[in-house]
Regions:
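Aromatic- and Gly/Pro-enriched helix-to-coil junctions and flexible linker segments
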Residues: 19-251
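Positively charged n-region of N-terminal signal peptides that target proteins for export
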Residues: 1-6
Length: 251
């Protein structure tokens, strides 16, 4: 019995796609070195030219990205509210799967894995470069950089309705969580799917800040310590809200 033609075409497409991904991975390994999942577990001092994460990068992410990428069920489980959420990366597994009969292992930041290497073992793939620490590699091997650049090349309309048939905003839509090896094909097949998805592109200034930050290795800078006056004020509120008296409990 001969297989249906459409089934043969589907099998060939899967084989070709898989071969292309392998070829792209080998090329990346040859040109930029093999990935090191522990790269961001060993934070280095940020270069002087890198935009500061707390004061320049995080405000852009909060303003333009976290409306979608904040919760644990964010698209591709990519949490952009925290630096360790960015370095953890993406995972195509759906959090709320209606057909799942058994419970799934949770993926809570700070609880269920404590290194990026451990997150890789749980199925997460990087969206930042984990290969050679050079500006070129930080651009070419970063899903985040390339998907932001894709939006800059194909910004779409700033207002009015979007082109019909190009975007799917349904809650149960299939997730497309492309690894870096698949980005060349993704960029060709879905030129309109840059980030922010279905929304106006980042401004030139915003994109420049994020691009320079990624090129510099996406360094993290901790929050500055609280002042003594603010710590004292917080202690007063903690004492008030956690008091044992009936009056304190009523408050």
């Amino acid at each position: 019995m001969r297989a249906p033609r459409h089934l043969i075409h589907l099998i060939l497409l899967i084989l070709i796609t898989g071969c292309t991904t392998v070829v792209n991975r080998v090329q990346l390994d040859r040109e930029l070195g093999r990935p090191d999942p522990g790269r961001f577990d060993r934070p280095a001092a940020p270069p002087a030219e890198a935009p500061d994460y707390q004061t320049r990068v995080r405000p852009i992410l909060e303003r333009r990205c976290v409306a979608c990428h904040a919760c644990y069920d964010a698209p591709c489980q990519l949490k952009l509210t925290r630096h360790d959420g960015i370095t953890r990366g993406a995972n195509a597994e759906s959090i709320y799967a209606g057909t799942r009969l058994l419970s799934a292992s949770p993926n809570r930041l700070g609880f269920d894995a404590h290194s990026n290497a451990a997150w890789r073992d749980k199925g997460f793939h990087p969206v930042l470069n984990e290969r050679a620490a050079t500006p070129q590699a930080n651009r070419e091997a970063s899903v985040l950089y390339r998907i932001l650049a894709l939006k800059q090349r194909n910004p779409g309309p700033d207002s009015g309705p979007l082109p019909g048939g190009r975007f799917d905003f349904s809650i149960d839509r299939p997730q497309t969580c492309t690894r870096i090896e698949g980005m060349p094909d993704f960029e060709k097949e879905h030129p309109d799917w840059g980030m922010p998805f279905g929304l106006p592109a980042l401004s030139t200034a915003e994109h420049d800040i994020l691009s320079r930050w990624i090129e510099a290795g996406a360094p993290f800078t901790p929050r500055p310590p609280l002042s003594a006056a603010l710590r004292a004020r917080l202690a007063e509120w903690e004492a008030l809200l956690n008091g044992d008296s009936l009056r304190d409990q009523l408050a």
